[in-house]
A protein has these predicted regions:
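Extended, alpha-helix-rich binding/interface surfaces that flank or overlap catalytic cores
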Residues: 14, 32-137
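Acidic-basic catalytic patches of nuclease active cores, encompassing PD-(D/E)XK
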Residues: 1-43
Length: 137
């Protein structure tokens, strides 16, 4: 099996994944991909779009919606199936777990000074939580 890896994959993440590929003997090469981050040359109509965690997926679905949607449309037009792989961690094992996920950006409290008084503010009141993300999937 040989894997094509998108050259735009984050350097730090690529180094971690490259080490894993090397450890288990997976052959790979890097080049710019039309959609996604990884694909097997055995099945070029199936690609993997890797997300570091649910916060990255929220950013794609909400803040970068048009770019993310355009990538999905390009895949559909070329009859490419995309698997979105979210490497969130041990607390998310199933799609249903996403529903109960608490976005730390939505609940992070910061103090700022307004007119000489300290005021408590939420880091990002518009941040998407698990229930909203689940419903959009």
């Amino acid at each position: 099996m040989q894997i094509q890896v998108d050259t735009r994959e984050h350097k730090k993440e690529w180094e971690r994944i490259r080490t894993q590929f090397d450890d288990i003997g997976v052959k790979y090469f890097r080049s710019k991909m039309y959609v996604g981050d990884y694909q097997s040359l055995d099945n070029p109509r199936l690609v993997i779009d890797r997300k570091k965690d649910l916060q990255e997926l929220c950013g794609n679905v909400c803040q970068q919606h048009e770019r993310f949607k355009a990538e999905l449309v390009r895949a559909i037009q070329q009859d490419i199936k995309i698997v979105i792989l979210v490497e969130h961690g041990e607390d998310i094992k199933t799609l249903e777990d996403v529903y109960f996920w608490q976005n730390p950006r939505k609940h992070e409290i910061r103090w700022k000074t307004v007119n000489g008084r300290k005021v408590k503010t939420v880091c990002s009141e518009k941040a998407v939580d698990g229930m909203q993300l689940y419903k959009s999937l």
